[in-house]
């Protein structure tokens, strides 16, 4: 049984930054530090930060007065930002800069009077935050997930539309929705550069390469991680047995029964330690020393909020 590792895999620059913001805030201000929503969608990471003194909440009403609060990597709505400001809470924003880029696109289109079609998954915190950035009462922002949604879509002005996308979607699926939008609304504007983030694209390209070499794919990631789910779906669509597992404890012999080549990758919010634990388990079951595929070397680094850098200098 051969083990092949995807490259790149695991943490992206936005996740690294978000986790470091929480770590630094705890170091500087001491526990408790409040975090609105899970800072990243990974159980291992969240549990580790909770042990250090992070308190995860879903509503700002759960945050006591005079507290420090961190917004998660997924971003928040304008309403949440304003509520924190009105209450005088000390806020550190761990929103991924690539999500912030989409927020800026939404602001620009709204200020220029356009309505927006947002390609994303209902209920995901990034979607809720981005849709909550639209503030033109004369227009609207509409969520679609599929070409079928586009067919049913009703907007106020079909000639004055733009679209943006959730950063963690499948590139292939997004492309089909964009094509449907352009067919239905020929004048629709899109972003100058694709909203799908570099790390999402790189990991999807890597899992496709992995699927070409392996008969079974294991994706390390939590079930609420959008980009991890997309990796599993891509491998599945390519005809491979594909499983999403949080950690080695969820790995079963049935998953790898009869496999000659097992590919292992990890979502952008999954730490490498979990990948190594999965590899160790596979080796116990007879797997050979893992080899890595060649892939893009990621050198992207996002800086911390200047206030936190200054406080921690």
Curated annotation (Swiss-Prot):
[4Fe-4S] cluster binds at residues 12, 96, 197. GO terms for biological process: dimethylallyl diphosphate biosynthetic process; isopentenyl diphosphate biosynthetic process, methylerythritol 4-phosphate pathway; terpenoid biosynthetic process. It catalyses: isopentenyl diphosphate + 2 oxidized [2Fe-2S]-[ferredoxin] + H2O = (2E)-4-hydroxy-3-methylbut-2-enyl diphosphate + 2 reduced [2Fe-2S]-[ferredoxin] + 2 H(+); dimethylallyl diphosphate + 2 oxidized [2Fe-2S]-[ferredoxin] + H2O = (2E)-4-hydroxy-3-methylbut-2-enyl diphosphate + 2 reduced [2Fe-2S]-[ferredoxin] + 2 H(+). It comes from the Bacteria. Its cofactor is [4Fe-4S] cluster. InterPro entries: LytB/IspH. Gene3D superfamilies: 3.40.50.11270, 4-hydroxy-3-methylbut-2-enyl diphosphate reductase, catalytic domain. Signal peptide: none annotated. Binds 1 [4Fe-4S] cluster per subunit. Pathway: Isoprenoid biosynthesis; dimethylallyl diphosphate biosynthesis; dimethylallyl diphosphate from (2E)-4-hydroxy-3-methylbutenyl diphosphate: step 1/1; Isoprenoid biosynthesis; isopentenyl diphosphate biosynthesis via DXP pathway; isopentenyl diphosphate from 1-deoxy-D-xylulose 5-phosphate: step 6/6. (2E)-4-hydroxy-3-methylbut-2-enyl diphosphate binds at residues 41, 74, 124, 167, 225-227, 269. Keywords: 4Fe-4S, Iron, Iron-sulfur, Isoprene biosynthesis, Metal-binding, Oxidoreductase. GO terms for molecular function: 4 iron, 4 sulfur cluster binding; 4-hydroxy-3-methylbut-2-enyl diphosphate reductase activity; metal ion binding. Coiled coil: none annotated. Catalyzes the conversion of 1-hydroxy-2-methyl-2-(E)-butenyl 4-diphosphate (HMBPP) into a mixture of isopentenyl diphosphate (IPP) and dimethylallyl diphosphate (DMAPP). Acts in the terminal step of the DOXP/MEP pathway for isoprenoid precursor biosynthesis. Belongs to the IspH family. HAMAP family: IspH. This is 4-hydroxy-3-methylbut-2-enyl diphosphate reductase. The gene is ispH.
